[in-house]
């Protein structure tokens, strides 16, 4: 029971950090913040403007017009991503809990298979006469139906009562 509670808690944590694709859009948005413009909608000209101006002023002479790759590579290497660490920690706990649940399931399945195998082995050793079983079943069904139709239950009950009274006296 505690394992299920832990799984539910971890599932809720992982949902908070999940990435969602906006319907009708081709790019992904992280988190729950307000949606910004898609790449085709917007500020590419604004971003390209200062970068191109810096290239023209000589700040990045070797980059020229294609500054995007070199400009952003350096800060990504130095920046620590706490969301990613928190997400990987939650995912690690979820995967550990799932592995434990899988082990429990496998143990249960093996025990069920062993029990089923033992039952089948006992059935093979015990003699079962199908013909005798069918005869007994048929006779019980016929006798029950006849006693219901003819009201023989009352007759049988009376006879049993009479025999018991005779035995007691």
UniProtKB/Swiss-Prot annotation:
Any one GO BP annotation for this protein? cell differentiation
Signal peptide boundaries: none
Q: How does it assemble?
A: Interacts via its LXCXE motif with the entire pocket region of RB1. Interacts with EP300, NR0B2 and TRIM27.
Q: Which molecular-function annotation in GO is an example for this chain?
A: histone acetyltransferase binding
Q: Where is this region: Interaction with NR0B2?
A: 54-120
How is expression of this protein distributed across tissues?
Expressed in all adult tissues examined and during embryogenesis.
The note filed under miscellaneous reads:
Inhibition of MYOD1 may be partly due to the ability of EID1 to bind and inhibit EP300 histone acetyltransferase activity.
Principal localisation: nucleus
The protein in question is named EP300-interacting inhibitor of differentiation 1
What cystine pairs are annotated?
none
InterPro entries linked: EID
